[in-house]
């Protein structure tokens, strides 16, 4: 059953999927020629659209069988989504940051990029062993960042119950790689092309 906001703001008889998709801007040839960049900022700029977006996640994670104890957000747009989702679910939020941004003792995980590597970190006291964690980001492309986030949480004994994102770019193979690793995924929209 849709939440009141989902019903109220599903305008012009559009489904939630269609409504959200209509508010994602595609920027051709950015950041490089041939890339179709999926810009989520229009989803955040309009309060009604942002509410529909957040309600789509909340509607899923209110289910007791998949309700998290903690939400972890990936640097940086995962912070925007994760903090609001955690607030709405009345659970804690923990940021997974790029290396060198957290002031306390951390664990780290390095992952490969198309041209190099990157490292993300998490405070060692961010989660407790056995915590059920929802790992959230804006988009899944190659899956490297989400995979690194999952490994960090597991190093601390947490159970990642699901990875979530607004957009999946299935042609880049990240969602397949994440599912093959055993991570359950929930994405609101799939976009072909990248």
From Swiss-Prot:
The keyword Phosphoprotein does not apply. The keyword Manganese does not apply. It catalyses: AMP + diphosphate = 5-phospho-alpha-D-ribose 1-diphosphate + adenine. GO terms for cellular component: cytoplasm. Pathway: Purine metabolism; AMP biosynthesis via salvage pathway; AMP from adenine: step 1/1. One of its GO terms (biological process) is adenine salvage. SUPFAM superfamilies: PRTase-like (SSF53271). GO terms for molecular function: adenine binding; adenine phosphoribosyltransferase activity; AMP binding. Its EC number is 2.4.2.7. Keywords: Cytoplasm, Glycosyltransferase, Purine salvage, Transferase. Belongs to the purine/pyrimidine phosphoribosyltransferase family. Homodimer. This is Adenine phosphoribosyltransferase.
């Amino acid at each position: 059953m849709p939440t009141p906001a989902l019903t109220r703001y599903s305008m012009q008889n559009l489904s939630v999927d269609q409504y959200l998709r209509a508010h994602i801007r595609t920027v051709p040839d950015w950041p490089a020629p041939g890339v179709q960049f999926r810009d989520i900022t229009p989803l955040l700029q309009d309060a009604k659209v942002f509410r529909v977006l957040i309600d789509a996640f909340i509607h899923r994670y209110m289910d007791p069988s998949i309700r998290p104890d903690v939400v972890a957000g990936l640097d940086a747009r995962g912070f925007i989504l994760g903090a609001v989702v955690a607030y709405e679910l009345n659970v804690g939020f923990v940021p997974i940051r790029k290396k060198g941004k957290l002031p306390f003792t951390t664990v780290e995980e390095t992952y490969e990029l198309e041209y190099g590597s990157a490292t993300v970190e998490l405070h060692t006291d961010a989660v407790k062993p056995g915590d059920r964690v929802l790992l959230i980001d804006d988009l899944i492309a190659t899956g490297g960042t989400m995979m690194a986030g999952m490994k960090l949480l597991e190093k601390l004994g947490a159970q990642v119950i699901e990875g979530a994102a607004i957009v999946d770019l299935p042609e880049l193979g990240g969602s397949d790689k994440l599912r093959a690793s055993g991570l359950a995924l929930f994405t609101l929209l799939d976009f072909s092309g990248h």
